[in-house]
Amino acid sequence: MPVFQAKTFRRATTASSSLGERIGAAYRGGLPKHPFLLFGLPFIMVIVAGSFVLTPAAALRYERYDRKVKQLSQEEAMELGLKGPDGEEGIRRNPRRRILGDEREEYYRLMAKDLDNWEQKRVQRFKGEPDGKL
């Protein structure tokens, strides 16, 4: 039986192997020896660089929002009907709009309702929809 060599086979770095293959082989060979230097450090650098790139984008987003929502002057508020000439009291409000008072007032208003006398009513179902009756 023939005897095989103990050395592992390594491809010769000839002109036929591309630069990318040679760099990849060197990277894979060095990765077990220096994992933080070849994997951890580039990862951390990408995260930090991404943070610096995204900071102006976030600032632009909030500046755009601030341009939309700005504080109105007294004259602009009067033009929009948000304030009357004598302040908040001169505003005509929708009478159907319910403005809640304090919690105590709301509590007593709810307690005054008669919650014991009620009747369950069935909701009308669509055609073909099961109504839950057996």
From Swiss-Prot:
GO terms for biological process: mitochondrial cytochrome c oxidase assembly. It comes from the Eukaryota. Keywords: Membrane, Mitochondrion, Mitochondrion inner membrane, Transit peptide, Transmembrane, Transmembrane helix. The chain crosses the membrane at residues 35-55. Disulfide bonds: none annotated. InterPro entries: Cyt_c_Oxase_assmbl_COX16 (IPR020164). It is a single-pass membrane protein. It is found in: Mitochondrion inner membrane. One of its GO terms (cellular component) is mitochondrial inner membrane. Its main location: mitochondrion. Residues 1-23 form a transit peptide. Pfam families: COX16 (PF14138). Required for the assembly of the mitochondrial respiratory chain complex IV (CIV), also known as cytochrome c oxidase. May participate in merging the COX1 and COX2 assembly lines. PANTHER family: CYTOCHROME C OXIDASE ASSEMBLY PROTEIN COX16 HOMOLOG, MITOCHONDRIAL, MITOCHONDRIAL OUTER MEMBRANE PROTEIN 25. Belongs to the COX16 family. This is Cytochrome c oxidase assembly protein cox16, mitochondrial. It comes from Aspergillus clavatus (strain ATCC 1007 / CBS 513.65 / DSM 816 / NCTC 3887 / NRRL 1 / QM 1276 / 107).
